[in-house]
Amino acid sequence: MWKGTLALLTCMQLAGCATPFEKMWQGLATCELDSLHLDSETGRPANPQLAIYTPDKVSDGFAWYKLHEELHGLPIVGFLVPASTFEVHALFVDTPIANARRLTHNAYGSEFADEQLHDEGMAPLLLRDPNNPKRSIIDCTRGESAEPLPEESFPE
């Protein structure tokens, strides 16, 4: 038992070894998350790692997921992905924006604050959660329509 745990911990520390959640979000820094969505016709995940998770709800073209995962040091409590043709992905980070900036800088070398790159769909934008000041949102919006995040708050 302890050997398996030790092997897992060793693997997690090596550069090439990532959790399924980290693999799923590996394109976050450049918002290259094309396979991270539900198929609009079948409702099935297009990404094998996404298939591990069950959406809490699917509404208005988005699939909402609640969970407790860590993404390169960021405490993630949920995410949303498209369940239609929208190109909006969001991670809900369980820490205030000042701490989230520090954590994203440590993990990605960026505070995800470049609005121009975000508007071009080339980088995420770190936002203060308007519904919960103790949380932050990492927003990746791509595509010509530049769809905004849904007005609905993240389900508690």
Predicted region positions:
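Sec-dependent bacterial lipoprotein signal peptides
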Residues: 1-15
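Extracellular/secretory pathway and lumenal proteins
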Residues: 15, 35, 142-145
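N-terminal export/targeting and maturation segments
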Residues: 17-69
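Short, exposed beta-strand/loop patches in secreted or surface proteins that constitute
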Residues: 53-56, 80-81, 124-130
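Long, charged/polar, surface-exposed segments that mediate recognition or autoinhibition
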Residues: 62, 67-122
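Non-cytosolic coordination micro-motifs
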Residues: 97-156
